Amino acid sequence: MNFLLVSRLSQSARSVYTIAKYVEVGAELGHEVAVFGEKTSEAPCLPYSLDIRSFDYAIFVVYESWDFPDMPYLAQLLDGVPKERRVIIDCCGRYNDTIRAEHDFNHLERMDGHQGWEWVEGFEAVSTKILQPTLTPLRPGVRPFLWHGFDPRDVAREYTAAQQAAQIWAADGKSYGMVYVGHNWQRWSQVGRLLEGLEPVREQLGSICLAGCDWDKRPEWAIQQGIKGADLDPELLKRLGVEAKLPIPYDKVAEFTSRARFSPVIHRPLFNHLRMVTNRTFSTFCADTIPILMLPEDMIRAVYGPQAQALSVGDDVAGKLSDMMRRPEVYWDAVLKTRAHLAERHSFSRRFAELMAILES
């Protein structure tokens, strides 16, 4: 079966890693997967196609309005692919009533110019199959499909036992104590809490790096429009000596994150409310680091399994990090068991099987 993925790609954000994995794993399973459009410098290694008739399904991977192609390309898709063979993966919960979580919204007209009803009617005009990467969709008729996944072949360093992992981790001389890779959009409420909480153990932990857009200062566009969500505390960042780096390309994230002892898994408030997963939910476990889970406890159990509870940072950030540094074998045991769980329950081959079942239903 052949799949045409429709989305605007960015080499350091959104679903580009996941799309690359669907192309790779799809070919291994006998499926052709390509991105609709002409080749882009954002992901030049991926296959692209404008030949709509060669594909069985068009799958729209939607974060923003610009993920829908401009005319005449959108018209070609709608005319050339029957509606029952068009699918939308709603990665930001747009196909809901307007939801606010802290100062995070699924509809923000000041930024994209679209009201909530426009998103709902627009989705329904394109497809009758709307999927969201959550186990618990709010809107009737939406199907749960996690979309993102885990590929054990991408694990940066394999270990046979927690003791081996802990010994190498402790002696590795990593460049950073902690690295977070992701843009400064609706992340500061959690990043700020994490940084404030770890301050008592900052010297023991080591250097901290935030890699992505707008970690050096609040962007001018957010100031001018009065939009919350790209906030930060310059004094806190300066006091902790936090390094801000430019965005990391999707195929270098695991390698870069492996340079740190720890890496937090952080979802924006809206995603926590909707229990939505992202590519980092899974791919962080590919890096040679101890993931720190800053997610709702029920979501940790549902996605990662009970063994991952040990990696939840909880309310005592400094105490948790101190214990992780003092007893790394305990936490590497949780990491290795969680990797095994992800490989069994959330592989991309399993995602393909789930997607095929939805399409054929």
Language model: regions and residue ranges:
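Conserved acidic donor-binding segment of nucleotide-sugar-dependent glycosyltransferases
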Residues: 306-315, 323-328
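Short acidic/histidine-rich motifs immediately flanking catalytic phosphotransfer sites
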Residues: 51-59, 260-261
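Glycosyltransferases and closely related glycan-assembly transferases
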Residues: 54, 69-86, 100-101
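A charged, aromatic-enriched C-terminal amphipathic alpha-helix characteristic of glycosyltransferases
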Residues: 325-359
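Short secondary-structure boundary/capping segments
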Residues: 103-106
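Nucleotide-sugar donor-binding catalytic core of glycosyltransferases
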Residues: 2-29, 35-46, 62-74, 91-93, ...
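Short amphipathic alpha-helix with an adjacent loop that forms part of the alpha/beta core around
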Residues: 46-54, 323-324
